[in-house]
Amino acid sequence: MKKNYFHLTLLLSLIGISFLSAQDLTVEKMRFLTPHWNGERFEDGRPKVSNDILTRMKKVTIEEAWGVLRNEGYHNQFEGGWQPLHNDMPLVGRALTVQYMPNRPDLADQVIKNGKANGAIGNTNSWPIDRLVEGDIYVADGFGKIVDGTLIGDNLGNAIYANSKNGVVFNASSRDMEGLSDIDGFNAFVRGWH
């Protein structure tokens, strides 16, 4: 369990930033927000942490991680209260991060219109799935909503795993826990289950 919380903490603290909203971040803005990254980047500007590093991070303990994080000035980076799908499976990857505002008809129409104009298909919660690559984790802030805050079930979970070979971290709820549990290699940290 300690390793899982470390991996979640590290994920949320250090690896990649990208927001889905009415506007995506530009490559320039992504570079501005990640100035200390000197390595390769994805087309959208996200840091491309190597798969080798991601594999090695699965073996790092919380104690080791906290030492490094504190020495680098990362204090107060822990967020508790997660409900993992699998307690014994680490979740490590590059974050593709999105934020979902509470639904408002005046904004929702504009966001959907903009997304469709930019080639997005399906509902807004599926748009980031098309951008995932192997090693990514779909990280979504749904403002901790449990009721009316469900972002995925097992159908989208299968699509996420097909693209990323990884899982999700949702500050919101998910459903179809049984179906998601059947996806070999998929893990989720969420605020609640339906």
What is the predicted role of each segment?
Residues V60-E64, L69-R70, Y74-H194:
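Feature captures the catalytic cores and cofactor-binding loops of soluble hydro-lyases/lyases
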Residues L20-A22:
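Boundary at the C-terminal end of the N-terminal hydrophobic targeting segment
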Residues M1-T9:
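Bacterial N-terminal signal peptides that target proteins for export
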Residues D24-F32, K116-N123:
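Phosphate-binding glycine-rich loops and adjacent basic patches that engage nucleotide phosphates
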Residues N4, L14, L33, E40-R41, ...:
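A generic structural signal for short, solvent-exposed coil/turn residues
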Residues L25, K29-K58, A65:
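Amphipathic alpha-helical packing elements
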Residues T9-S18:
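Bacterial N-terminal signal peptides
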